[in-house]
Amino acid sequence: MQVKQDHIVLVLLALAFGGLAWLVVISTGTEGGEDSFMHYLFARYVPQHPANLLDHWGKPLHTLLLTPFAQFGFTGAKIYSALAACITAWFTYKTAQKLGLATAMAAIVLLLFSPLYFLCINSALTEITFALVLSAGIYLIVSDKYYIAAVVLSLLPFARTEGFILMPFIGIYYLLRKKYYPFLFLGLGVVGYSLIGYFHFEDILWVFSQNPYSDKVGVYPTSSHFWQYGDAYPLILGRPQTLIFVIGFISFLLAFNRASKTGISNAGDPFKHWLLIVVLALAFFFAHSIVWHFGIMGSAGLSRVFAGIMPLLALISARGIEAIYKPFAFNRNLRLALVCTVLFIVVEFVFQNHRFPVHLGPEERLLYKSGEWYKNSGYYKPGNKIYYFAPTVGIAYDVDPFDPSQRAYLDAAKNSENIPSGSIIVYDMHFGPNECKIQPEEIKNNPDYELLKQFTPEEPFTTLGGYNYEIFIFRRK
């Protein structure tokens, strides 16, 4: 019976991949905006710049897995995300099955059609790779394959930095389960990447010393509302699934209360596996709430980071489906109708609240427009050095962003005496005054620069920091 069900699930996932692939192909835009484009560029230029495979912001494991697909363009990178999502759904389903959930297949729908995760599939973002590694590791743990689980989970920090948040809790779980030898393999990823990176950075501690978020304070605003991510549930899980998730979480708390009376150490393996899943989800939630509240470690307060732990959230939601399902054990058809109705509402919520296919955002559209103007202007010269920050410029202006002869960061334009004559400066009101800390007047009023073109959207809108979005193209005299 289980083998037959697995075959059905594989067929359904193959169909899901086909549907997701079609959706990302017809979508010109992407979730994550500039971050998504930048992750694509890191992978796209790996053949020319192998050191990209060790870039901490790009995330080494994510860039490695994305590279073969990125050679086919940005759409190829999004195809990777669709494939990774379907593999993640398989691991999530198998984990639910191992945990004894009769409604394990529901976990696939709850994962793929949680609004945030569904949106992130149409991107080149690291959250998808993080979810893939996490789901594989959790599945291996519940399958009692602790050695290989440790190896897989040791790679989490190289998919996203939050891996360093989850690893201590995973390590404690291993020690409490007396898996002492497998515990040692949890450090394999850090050791391996430290040794590989040493030959490039000449720093055995590069994994920690080159963390791009360790001293990033003050770039983004802080929040006085600690529970911001809790309030973001309509985007993260969607309203229907949030209700199911709450039921699943309450079901776990009741099980925890029962286990605490007899001793948690005496509880069975399924409960201990559930405890790990819930603790990891809570650790992730509180860690992000803290760094956003205090404005540390480069937190921008983005809800999309929770796509990385969506397999955990989907499993808790699947537990909620199970709690709804069990009271109707007397009637198989009624159970099936109830579950199908709930899942239909979950899927419907996504398509009712989001438009598909996804088109380019207003910032990206204006950047592409400016790129078309530049390439058709008399100022365009192949290989000309361009100073910019917005990653979309690398695509729109046909620039290799990792070639220092073609590209430099916008903040370098502050010192005009160091800018070669004829160089182009692409200043946009998103990154210019925020990440680069340069006001447009600083360049406008500099006699060494001339303004070539100003791009203003037909329908004005504000960007990060409350600035009216515009693009200014300057040339160094």
Residue ranges and their predicted role:
Residues 119-129:
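Short acidic/glycine- and proline-prone juxtamembrane loop motifs at membrane-interface regions
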Residues 10-13, 187-191, 257, 263-266, ...:
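Signature aromatic-anchored transmembrane alpha helix within multi-pass, membrane-resident enzymes
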Residues 127, 165, 276, 295-326:
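Hydrophobic/aromatic-rich transmembrane helices and adjacent perimembrane loops
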Residues 76-101, 132, 136:
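Transmembrane-helix motifs of polytopic, lipid-linked glycan transferases
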Residues 89-92, 171, 237-278:
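Hydrophobic, aromatic-rich transmembrane alpha-helices
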Residues 47, 337, 341-401, 405-409, ...:
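Membrane-embedded, lumen/periplasm-facing catalytic core of multi-pass transferases
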Residues 38, 180-249, 281-288:
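Membrane-lumen/periplasm interface segments of specific transmembrane helices
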Residues 89-94, 110, 114, 129-152, ...:
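Specific aromatic-rich, kink-prone transmembrane helix
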